[in-house]
Amino acid sequence: MSQANLSETLFKPRFKHPETSTLVRRFNHGTQPSVQSTLDGKNVPHWYRMINRLMWIWRGIDPREILDVQARIVMSEAERTDKELYDTVIGYRGGNWIFEWSKQAMEWQQKACQETDPQRSGRHWLHASSLYNIAAYPHLKGDELAEQAQALANRAYEEAAQRLPGSLREMAFSIPGGAPVTAFLHMPKGDGPFPTVLMCGGLDSMQTDYYTLFERYFAPRGMAMLTLDMPSVGFSSKWKLTQDSSLLHQHVLKALPGVPWVDHTRVVAFGFRFGANVAVRLAYLEAPRLKAVACLGPVVHALLSDSQRQGTVPEMYLDVLASRLGMHDASDEALRVELNRYSLKVQGLLGRRCPTPMLSGFWKNDPFSPEEESRLITSSSSDGKLMEIPFNPVYRNFDTALKEITGWINHRLC
């Protein structure tokens, strides 16, 4: 499709699509406590979505660009689902969250197409991909406009990967009983097979959100990174998240001996937030296939089993959980009962001795992941390492933590 036609298709106003905040209809909407965390951002008054500035900046978005897009959304006088929430403009038009972030992404996509230097063009494509991902955030099931933005994010990511250092391969893995899934294998310079980090991302992120992790931390150490979307989103959208949360990653892990670029004898799993649920499950179920497991702000028990803690997290995050579980119309009580089944302690795993070395990093007073969560993980391992990460300065401490975790992973892979 030509650039002009793509623009016309993208930015033609459409009003029949449901607005994101209406997709999950839970019944007990309460008052919203103030929440701020490094990995999830903060719930800012008058916004439905959590504003995750740190992670967006970490992925390469300029803070001024974030403010510019937010300003366009705030200034819109278009009809909203909720007059009190800026990012609930109805229809695909000016002021709508998905429209404005996609419009910003298109500007970078056009720059990428016009740039003759492959390296700079690749950077612009990567920037566009990150912006399209923000447009699709928080990736709720049935959000048609967000799914279109996600498709554009994936396309931009593929374009970026062709131009940036290292090598990227898009790989299909067959999963018994359902559709195959697509993963991205990021390889550093040099000859493989490479020691590999299997990324297990959070429920509100996509596999294309982690290029920075590969480029800054893993690639310099000669490690490859294999990413896979969590069940129910992105390339794994045909799979529903179940209590067997590690199902997709487990099948991919088992298939690695057949991937010539991966040294399947040197694989580590790294989980962010709910991705740690997947990674720690793998530590128990696939111990012979993993050298180690690292977690950051894990969600493996407390948030899944403690109704008081669930009451302190923002509306959007509960909507994400309900969406992933396919419980779009569930009451909070029904959601709590189901979430409890996802606790690895309730499942009888955590608390039992695990032979896999496990590291877990935490922030004090993290509303999503208390210190006890990380202690439970590391004390269950025969070789556990607990890492406390100071909150301020946020960006520097996040970078330092990732460097330390990468060093620990590298040591386990040697």
Swiss-Prot record:
The entry's keywords: Hydrolase, Serine esterase
Enzyme Commission number(s) of this protein: 3.1.1.1
GO molecular-function terms, A-Z: carboxylesterase activity
SUPFAM superfamilies, sorted: alpha/beta-Hydrolases
Keyword Hydrolase: yes
Family: Belongs to the FrsA family.
Known role: Catalyzes the hydrolysis of esters.
Name recorded for this polypeptide: Esterase FrsA
